[in-house]
Amino acid sequence: MLAIVAYIGFLALFTGIAAGLLFGLRSAKIL
């Protein structure tokens, strides 16, 4: 149970970081 929660949390964190990087690169291109 705990491993599943940790795995989901890790995926959410990784997705958030990837989205942040993509958004940052897109903003840099616009600027």
Swiss-Prot record:
Q: Where in the cell is it found?
A: Cellular thylakoid membrane
Q: Which GO terms describe its biological process?
A: photosynthesis
- Per the UniProt record, one Pfam family is PetL
Membrane-spanning residues where? 3-23
The main location is membrane
Organism domain of life: Bacteria
Q: Which GO terms describe its molecular function?
A: electron transporter, transferring electrons within cytochrome b6/f complex of photosystem II activity
Specify whether Membrane is a keyword of the entry. Answer: yes
Membrane topology, as annotated, equals: Single-pass membrane protein
Report keywords, A-Z: Electron transport, Membrane, Photosynthesis, Thylakoid, Transmembrane, Transmembrane helix, Transport
Q: Which InterPro entries match?
A: Cyt_b6/f_cplx_su6 (IPR007802)
Q: Which GO terms describe its cellular component?
A: cytochrome b6f complex; plasma membrane-derived thylakoid membrane
Q: What does this chain do?
A: Component of the cytochrome b6-f complex, which mediates electron transfer between photosystem II (PSII) and photosystem I (PSI), cyclic electron flow around PSI, and state transitions. PetL is important for photoautotrophic growth as well as for electron transfer efficiency and stability of the cytochrome b6-f complex.
Looking up NCBIfam families in the UniProt record yields: PRK11874.1
Q: Per the similarity annotation, which family is this?
A: Belongs to the PetL family.
Subunit comment for this entry? The 4 large subunits of the cytochrome b6-f complex are cytochrome b6, subunit IV (17 kDa polypeptide, PetD), cytochrome f and the Rieske protein, while the 4 small subunits are PetG, PetL, PetM and PetN. The complex functions as a dimer.
Identify the HAMAP family for this entry. Cytb6_f_PetL (MF_00433)
Supply the name of the protein.
Answer: Cytochrome b6-f complex subunit 6
Q: From which source organism is this entry?
A: Nostoc sp. (strain PCC 7120 / SAG 25.82 / UTEX 2576)
What are the leading ranks of the lineage? Bacteria, Bacillati, Cyanobacteriota, Cyanophyceae, Nostocales
